Amino acid sequence: MVLAELIGKVRTDYKILTRSLLTGVNQIDQFMIPVPFDHEENALQKSLEMRRRAMEHLENGGVIVLFPSGKVASSETMFGKVVEGDWNPFTAKLIQKSGADVLPVFFPGSNSRIYQIANQISATLRQGLLIYEVVHAMNKPQKPLIGNIIKQDEISSWKSDPRGFMKWLREKTIKLGSNG
């Protein structure tokens, strides 16, 4: 939501790829494209529709906001360090096929330890706490760190290696956090 507010100050032609759990709110629904969970009914069809809508929006000159790992950064154990997951090659395909430039944004911090523990216990508990975490974060000052735009000239050099591109972009984005 913080990112939506920042983008909305500059442009209104953005869409956020987000879990369907966080969509359906009338005031913001026009800015959302739902990403289905794997276990949802018709997940494959919904996923293909999500990809089609995202690509169409980019082809029309719009902005797509996404979280490339497809999940919230979390710890691998109840009390472990929070880690950003590997980034999905779908993101590379979306960027490369659309010809879009990329603006990396890093959000410092992480969800609460209770969320991290819930993540180890139950997907349902984790999802329930995610809504709490979003609401809780909205009531605190956020300081996203914004990198430089990465142009297609640089992106195109990764065309034959989408996984390498995602690894490089992930490291570049996370590094914003150590420089901030």
Protein language model features and the residues they cover:
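Non-catalytic C-terminal accessory region of glycerolipid acyltransferases
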Residues: L44-G180
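Catalytic core of membrane glycerolipid acyltransferases/transacylases, capturing the structured
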Residues: M1-A43
